[in-house]
């Protein structure tokens, strides 16, 4: 099975943003076993975070972030990759394994419904909760025209 680029980007993003303990628990509950070899052992490094002034202005480097990457190959030759923020090497390897399994038609539907969709829903709930927390303390400023400034 060959997933289109946008679909693969979506599941890789969901995996990268997932909570390591939650991903491990959900994957273990599925009882999926797969023989694979590690092509690139999980390794940790730094990446520079780029931003833009006002979202559209000149690019600048906002700082550094720790990133861990991994690559695995299933026995049938399917390659799986992952890049996750932080230093959790097991999480990176687990994400790479799931990426490889998601590319196989026999696992795609099951993993999409029982792993990727719930992880995505959990992430959206975390984002919504954080947004609600921020909105609760939001202050909207406005300017009133005074009589002497009119």
Curated annotation (Swiss-Prot):
Q: Which gene encodes it?
A: phnG
Q: Quote the function comment for this protein.
A: Together with PhnH, PhnI and PhnL is required for the transfer of the ribose triphosphate moiety from ATP to methyl phosphonate.
More info: The sequence shown is that of strain K12.
The residues forming the signal peptide are: none
Which InterPro entries would you find in this protein's record?
A: Phosphonate_metab_PhnG
Respond yes or no to whether keyword Transferase is given for this record.
yes
Q: What are its GO biological-process terms? A: organic phosphonate catabolic process; organic phosphonate metabolic process; organic phosphonate transport
Protein name, per record? Alpha-D-ribose 1-methylphosphonate 5-triphosphate synthase subunit PhnG
